[in-house]
Amino acid sequence: INGRILTPQGWLKDGSVLICDGKILEVTNSDLAVIGATVIDARGMTIVPGFVSMHAHGGGGHDFTEATEEAFRIAATAHLKHGATGIFPTLSSTSFERIYQAVDVCEKLMKEPESPILGLHIEGPYLNPKMAGSQYDGFLKTPDENEYIPLLERTSCIRRWDISPELPGAHDFAKYTRSKGIMTAVTHTEAEYDEIKAAFAVGFSHAAHFYNAMPGFHKRREYKYEGTVESVYLTDGMTVEVIADGIHLPATILKLVYKLKGVENTCLVTDALAYAAYEGNEPIDPRYIIEDGVCKMADHSALAGSLATMDVLVRTMVKKANIPMEDAVRMASETPARLIGVSDRKGALAKGKDADIVILDKELNVRCVWSMGKIVPGTDNLLHK
């Protein structure tokens, strides 16, 4: 594949990515043809690593919390076509019976050799009900080791779990998940500095959808207090993710997060619902409405989730927040791959990594996607120029 290439060391202006048997064989600054190889000419375009989506609830008209093989396949494929070659399906707050069903589906699909599904992400049900947002109130509870320990003893497919750190039992939960190598994030929280500092010490390493479902600087009577947002900024080593659709957060805040937390500590996430990459017009869930390019609660009490795919996030960061393209791409690929533990094979265009490749045109639209060395159906635009 010939074109302008983003490597871990920087840009190759006119180079080639050689792929074989699903892996990257070599990334070179030469665009000379290789004998016996099929050549994809992407000159004038940009070749970047496949994106790693570690917080998306659904897409293509299906929600991962449906916990069916059909829902997982359709939603994952919807995001794959937009460049997400590594996907961690996200469950909203639900019953443990449904979580076990989702685990069974996830484990099955992860065994398929070319599956983009890399593990499961759970958001809830251990959430502060005051900060529930669009989460299902009826499932919210405090952490119960009689629920989560048997689950995590049974499966290793759960790679991330987000809860409210101020709940009773939250610290024991985080200590246990950390012992299992599971990324644990604060979310839907009112925690202030001392609580965030204590949470970080026991294993909460990440802040989910930073700024959303958490307070910033605020007053109680005549006194002022730091919020969760400032507390996370002050906690060195705590990483963050932002819903960079340009709606959940304005461009100025996206730029602020980039400046203060940096590329190494910031991930781009969609937090997408079933409506992402969905061709229908009617809401799937009566609790929601689609308005102004985003999913809202029908009572206008809160944003419910985005309609974005990973390519939208990169375009937003570059075009609206004026972030350098290489940094925007890294926050959508290299950084999430490292934080969630798949950087040995995902997140970068380098020898030996999986051949997960996205080709973008000058407007940063996806022109072609390779997943494990194979062109994703429906994205073979370069073959029909």
Question: Model-predicted segments: where are they?
Answer:
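N-terminal metal-binding scaffold of metallo-dependent hydrolase/deaminase domains
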Residues: 1-34
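Active-site gating loops and adjacent loop-to-helix segments of metal-dependent hydrolytic enzymes
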Residues: 77-88, 128-155, 198-239, 279-303
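Active-site core of metal-dependent hydrolases
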Residues: 153-278
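Conserved, mostly hydrophobic/aromatic
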Residues: 44, 79, 122, 177, ...
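Divalent metal-dependent hydrolysis catalytic cores, especially in the metallo-beta-lactamase
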Residues: 57, 61, 73-102, 115-128, ...
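C-terminal cap of metal-dependent C-N hydrolases
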Residues: 3, 280, 338, 348-385
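His/Asp/Glu-enriched, well-ordered alpha-helical/loop segment
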Residues: 224-242, 258-270, 275-360
